[in-house]
């Protein structure tokens, strides 16, 4: 469950390390976002000499949350951290690698490129 002012780790090699959520996209006044939702965030920590700089405003898709995800099969899954992958306006990832596992719900929300780059899909 991601809301305004939530900090997230970045799960790709775009150059950003930490994000601060500014807004959850979708709906007029949407409060919470989960796996597969797009957020607007600002970069709080970044690697030097990379395209993404500190204080940049970026779009990202949530790939892991500490809040458990309940699936239709009755199974629930929970991750150790809140993480996101930076995307461009077309919805494609800005980095070329994705680190750590991602949830299967991303495939249902048409982020297949991120799913194919991920080392593990849970």
Curated annotation (Swiss-Prot):
Gene Ontology CC entries for this record: cytosolic large ribosomal subunit
One Pfam family cited in the UniProt record for this chain: Ribosomal_L14
Keyword ATP-binding: no
Keywords recorded for this protein, A-Z: Ribonucleoprotein, Ribosomal protein, RNA-binding, rRNA-binding
GO biological process, one term: translation
GO molecular function: large ribosomal subunit rRNA binding; structural constituent of ribosome
Function, in words: Binds to 23S rRNA. Forms part of two intersubunit bridges in the 70S ribosome.
Family: Belongs to the universal ribosomal protein uL14 family.
Official protein name in the record: Large ribosomal subunit protein uL14
Gene name of the record: rplN
């Amino acid at each position: 469950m991601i809301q305004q002012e939530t900090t997230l780790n970045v799960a790709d090699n775009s150059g950003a390390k930490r994000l601060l959520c500014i807004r959850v996209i979708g709906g007029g006044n949407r409060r919470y976002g989960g796996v597969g939702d797009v957020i607007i965030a600002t970069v709080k920590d970044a690697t030097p000499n990379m395209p993404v700089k500190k204080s940049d405003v970026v779009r990202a898709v949530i790939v892991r949350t500490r809040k458990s995800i309940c699936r239709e099969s009755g199974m629930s899954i929970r991750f150790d951290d809140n993480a996101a992958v930076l995307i461009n306006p077309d919805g494609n990832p800005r980095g070329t690698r994705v680190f750590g596992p991602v949830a299967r719900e991303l495939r249902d929300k048409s982020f297949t490129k991120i799913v194919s780059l991920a080392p593990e899909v849970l």
